[in-house]
Amino acid sequence: MSLTFLHILIISATVFAVIGSGFYVSRSVRSSAGYSVAGRSAGASLVAGSIAGTVVGGGATVGTAQLAYSFGLSAWWFTLGSGIAFILMGIFYAKRLHNTALETIPQYLELYYGKKAETLSSIISSIGILLSAVASSLPGIEIISALFGLTPFLSALLLMALVIAYTFFGGMKSAAVSGILKMVIIWISLFISGAIAFLLLQENNTLSSFPASHFDLMGQGTDSAMAHLFSVIVGVLCTQTYIQCIFSADTPLKAASGCFIAALIVIPIGLPSVAVGMYMHAAEPETLPILVLPTFLVNHVPVLIAGL
């Protein structure tokens, strides 16, 4: 797997566009509330963009393809579970949380359980966000190392710089606008890639070579599937990153609508990665599982789409 100059050019332009959009929006941020909760003026689209842009990272794309390479359709549980969590958030959480006019989960818990609960929840929430960030970053580090020949340490530094640039200048508002642009790019590139993978699977008549478990959401066992679903739902509902998006909404209705729109965006986005993972398992079984998606993009997808 090697990148052409055009690949690198398109990748650079895409990164610049996503980060640049956030930097442009940051000029309108004038207060701490504007930074942390977008001035509580976000519409449903911005709420959805910030939520979806946060959850759809390396785990939802590269990680899903990696699992699909080994297990098939059951790799869909991450994005499917995230979407279900957003629906639950919109139904049960959005209105109640938004009406408190707070900014964090610990602040909300302090209202009912006191200062000790706030302190403890702050520590637990920070650890949870750290673990989530690590899980999302590992695929990115591996891909940067493979594509550009950098050491894991340098790849981690580069990824860290990009993540900081993504939100540093404008906070929640930058994350929301960048998230919308990021979702457009990912939807276009992934669904075209998924369609190509599915057509290749049909052309080569390889679908029949997979065991039945690869076409079953419960292919890894019902207990395992439910454990995946439960862990994703709990992780989403308890994570400050997603709750903060609700606090940034203009009205409770827009907060709930943003959650539902995010669910519509996130739920189907795992399917193209599943198709890619299954094709690569059949056609290029020597590929490292974590490099399944980038390898497919470079080798089988037009440069313009692959670069995105």
Q: Which role does the model predict for each range below?
A:
Residues 15-18, 54-55, 82-86, 126-129, ...:
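Residue-level recognition of pore/gate-forming positions within transmembrane alpha-helices
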